[in-house]
Amino acid sequence: LFRDVTNKAIHLQHFEGKRVALYGPSTYRWIVNLFGIILAGKDVVLVDSFLPHKERESLLEKVGVDYILSSTNQYILADSHAIMIPGAEKDDVEGEYNPQTPEGNVLVFTATDKESDKAVVLTTQNLMYTVNAMNHHCYCSEHDRVLAQTMLFHIFGLVYSLLWPLANGACVCVGRGLRHIDAETYYYKTTILPGTPSMIEYLKRIKAFNPELRTIVIGGAPSSYKLFENLKDRNYNVYTIYGMAECSGGIAVNREMDGSYELY
């Protein structure tokens, strides 16, 4: 992963623009592009690939992107109108990466009941603060297998399904898509499962919790106490995350039956 990310960063440093939109399914190539953009010193704008074209264009216009990397264009660098840049078909990895390059920021979109989507700018320091705070509450190690079924362009998925496990040396198991969602936990022998309340409720209902699973992290939407209680009664370590994009996805965590939250 590090070699691929570094090569992507070297390639992107040949281009002057400072802000890159990234959208596509959560795959290994998406992850490489995410970290490559950041290491190249450019801001990465995470966009929902399922958005209608005009809505996506409107969001990107708001934040003023210089380039686009998308699965539609096979992650070949394109301009702000999604037109592939001549000569960018193959990554140019000539030269060496300068480790002193300042890291780029991560932009995610958020929305409220009264306002349309707004971009939130998060630094790597912001994100790692949340990761380190989570480590004070929940154990994750290089022996764990964390299933990343949640959308990685959402702050909950980005932090708890990708950054947190990688920071602890755990194996991140990228979901293979909706067709396989019922069998992913058994296929990967998952030990830690982050998910939204509806996702966890569904997997519980279809008996998709594999024998190796020991920890469930719930977030991304309000969760019922009934779900928390039911999972605790089955002897799982359960963590309910309260957070917003503006706070790097972490404000507090609940792991006790009394419903109390511990602040990050």
PLM-predicted stretches and their roles:
Residues 97, 105-132:
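Conserved AMP-binding A3 loop
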Residues 128-145, 153-192:
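Conserved AMP-binding/adenylation subdomain of ANL enzymes
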Residues 4, 24-25, 45-60, 149, ...:
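ATP-dependent adenylate-forming carboxylate-activation enzymes
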Residues 8-50, 151:
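Conserved AMP-binding/adenylate-forming
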Residues 28-46, 57, 134-136, 155-168, ...:
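Hydrophobic alpha-helical segments in the ANL/AMP-binding
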Residues 191-195, 203-259:
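Gly/Ser/Thr-rich phosphate-binding loop
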Residues 57, 74, 78-105, 130-131:
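Flexible, low-complexity linker/hinge segments
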